[in-house]
Amino acid sequence: MYTLARQLLFKLSPETSHDLSLDLIGAGGRLGLNGMLCKQPAALPVSVMGLNFANPVGLAAGLDKNGAAIDGFAQLGFGFVEIGTVTPRPQPGNPKPRLFRLPEATAIINRMGFNNLGVDHLLERVRAARYNGVLGINIGKNFDTPVERAVDDYLICLDKVYTAASYITVNVSSPNTPGLRSLQFGDSLKQLLDALAERREQLAVTHGKRVPLAIKIAPDMSDEETALVAAALMASGMDAVIATNTTLGREGVEALPHGGEAGGLSGAPVLAKSTHIVKVLAGELGGKLPIIAAGGITEGRHAAEKIAAGASLVQIYSGFIYKGPALIREAVDAIAAMPRV
């Protein structure tokens, strides 16, 4: 059924198709239809960050930026749902067109620019949802906030989403907000992580619970840079790392229609690069922090490869656009079939 739906949706512009799909998934969730229409994955519970996941395959941030379809996505069989990226204030994002399909490569290029309705609106949607599973909320900075004051935006969002989230992801790796990726390195990263850790401890006392913090990083880093990030995450007391966001690279898509568009490339072409980052992180972290792997999972076996590389959980987005809910089941089945260590 999804194959037919995709054929129809792919006749529309990518962003129109995205918005319509989100509306349909949200409506199906409100009516309780998605679970009946989609075969559910096998149960494969796992505990990570002190949280209990129904299965290790989650929805990556970016597909549901405003929390419009939380129940709908959960009913499709995801083991966890991550919404956002959300910013303190609403913002329109970059000018259109800003989303491009590369079907020959099972890939997408986007330069959305954190378009969202703001953190207050997102919280309204979270409160309206019935979903009681693991919910991640991905936070970022507004476009017009100077990078020197980015910490302020992250702390505003952290304060607001703290009690609503199962875990909180700090997005310092989108290539579509100028200067954002500089926060992954050196003193900028240390200052951000220290500020987040200090505020989180204050919030934990106030609210009587410690919400895990995950940092989402880019795939476009050297092994040495990745090692430095891993050390900083451990030193600051972060709880997980999400590897990875989209890539600025264009290997394998340069000659394709839209292959030269500016923005972040996701989907199949980022698989090897992203999985390499997971392997490097696993070696550096030595099991002290869990890794949530995202990037290039378009077949079930890719999810198993991420777990074999050292990840505890995986997330999908572009693969879901191309393959639909069946990819969730395939990924869960592939992970379940892995030899027990």
Swiss-Prot record:
Monomer. FMN binds at residues 61-65, 85, 138, 171, 216, 244, 267, 296, 317-318. GO terms for biological process: 'de novo' pyrimidine nucleobase biosynthetic process; 'de novo' UMP biosynthetic process. It is an enzyme of class 1 (oxidoreductase). GO terms for molecular function: dihydroorotate dehydrogenase (quinone) activity. PROSITE patterns: DHODEHASE_1 (PS00911). Binds 1 FMN per subunit. Its EC number is 1.3.5.2. This is Dihydroorotate dehydrogenase (quinone). It comes from Pseudomonas putida (strain GB-1). It catalyses: (S)-dihydroorotate + a quinone = orotate + a quinol. Belongs to the dihydroorotate dehydrogenase family. Type 2 subfamily. The keyword Membrane applies. It is a peripheral membrane protein. GO terms for cellular component: cytoplasm; plasma membrane. The active site is at residue 174. The lineage of its organism: Bacteria, Pseudomonadati, Pseudomonadota, Gammaproteobacteria, Pseudomonadales. Pathway: Pyrimidine metabolism; UMP biosynthesis via de novo pathway; orotate from (S)-dihydroorotate (quinone route): step 1/1.
